[in-house]
Regions:
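Extended surface/linker regions that mediate inter-domain or inter-protein docking
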Residues: 2-261, 266-355, 359-364
């Protein structure tokens, strides 16, 4: 114990969720690691995820500039090993480092894109709309766009930038938290630089506080150059992307395209088939635990829910009175999920990916 502030905090880590110490905090056995149920071993999952390794991005840059012979990933921002790889994943990644033998493009990539970037090991830039923590807290501890504290702790200055909005963890992660990394701008592979969006801070002006919520959401959610369906900006990111997609599933995937599996057809089905569903029969089903932790939707044994192509139960999308109802994981709002089957959709059997749906269902800003 000490009365001096600096002495009292000696040896403490401001963010115990940072990957440098997470094995001694969140990842202790019996907490988020060491379980017989692999879905609860979040330490292994997230440290091997693409958000931690950026394996595909590193491979693309090195291949483009001739530093490796193919697009196979050999390096990650952090090194990692998967003792039980799948046929489409890799067994290990070496840590990416710039050496005297590295190409100048690799050094530029590390300096301009990886350092101070959007990856779980790197602290965020101290700029509006980019504040966040590292490690697990990058997603599970929410920050305001202006980086100011709004909680009830009297010891935290309310005018000091860089604090989370509140000192608490959550699984109800809004799109605005995801936007502190995603949708911030565009990379130039040619120039090895990152160009921030011109329509939002820190380049553009702050959006007016009087802007209606839906208009503000659409403005912030996606970049002007993109095409997106209405459900993609009406819902939050976690309403579509599953835990395994966002946090990893314990395997070292080579790139986002190979890892990502949620498609429009997962929830909306096709012209010939409705979405796949399954009943919750096991009281220990991981979907029940996720619902309890989230708190914005109820789920129980006997409920019928949508299932992904990998067998992952989507507890927030439930069969109710002959309809599929989706419950928002951030606010609990209810949405009726429209089905392709029985509609006037012109979908072709060989065109089932989401990119084909965007051709007709894109929403113009």
């Amino acid at each position: 114990l000490a009365l001096d502030k600096a002495q009292a905090h000696t040896g403490l880590r401001p963010n115990p969720a940072d990957f440098s110490v997470v094995a001694q905090s969140c990842g202790q056995s019996g907490c988020h690691a060491g379980h017989a149920d692999p879905s609860r071993n979040h330490l292994e999952q997230v440290t091997r995820s693409l958000q931690a390794t950026y394996a595909g991005g590193i491979a693309l840059v090195r291949y483009t500039f001739g530093a490796q012979k193919d697009l196979s990933p050999y390096f990650g921002i952090v090194g990692a090993v998967d003792p039980q790889p799948l046929p489409q994943t890799v067994p290990a990644l070496a840590p990416f480092a710039v050496t005297s033998a590295s190409l100048s493009a690799e050094a530029q990539f590390a300096r301009n894109c990886l350092a101070g970037g959007c990856h779980l090991t790197e602290p965020a830039a101290d700029q509006p709309y980019r504040y966040r923590a590292t490690g697990c807290a990058a997603c599970h501890v929410l920050y305001s766009d202006d980086g100011l504290y709004t909680g009830a702790d009297p010891t935290t200055p309310r005018d000091e930038l860089g604090h989370p909005a509140r000192h608490q963890l959550t699984t109800a992660i809004p799109f605005s938290q995801c936007n502190h990394c995603h949708n911030r701008g565009n990379y130039s592979l040619r120039g090895m630089t990152f160009t921030l969006r011109p329509d939002l801070p820190p380049v553009g002006a702050l959006l007016p506080a009087t802007m209606p919520p839906e208009g503000r959401r659409l403005r912030e959610y996606y970049q002007p150059i993109g095409q997106f369906t209405q459900c993609e900006w009406k819902l939050d990111c976690i309403d579509c992307h599953t835990q395994a997609e966002a946090m990893g599933d314990g395997h070292l995937w080579p790139d986002q395209k190979t890892m990502q599996y949620m498609q429009c057809r997962t929830c909306h089905g096709t012209l010939t088939e409705p979405p796949a569903t399954a009943k919750i029969t096991d009281p220990n089903d991981p979907a029940l635990r996720l619902a309890r932790l989230n708190g914005h939707y109820a789920l129980g044994v006997g409920d019928e829910v949508v299932v992904t192509e990998r067998g992952e139960k989507l507890g927030s999308i439930q069969q109710r009175n002959g309809q599929l109802i989706q419950f928002g994981k951030v606010d609990g709002r209810e949405y009726v999920v429209p089905l392709v089957q029985g509609s006037q959709c012109q979908q072709q059997p060989d065109q089932q990916e989401s990119r084909f749906c965007h051709q007709c269902h894109a929403y113009e800003r």
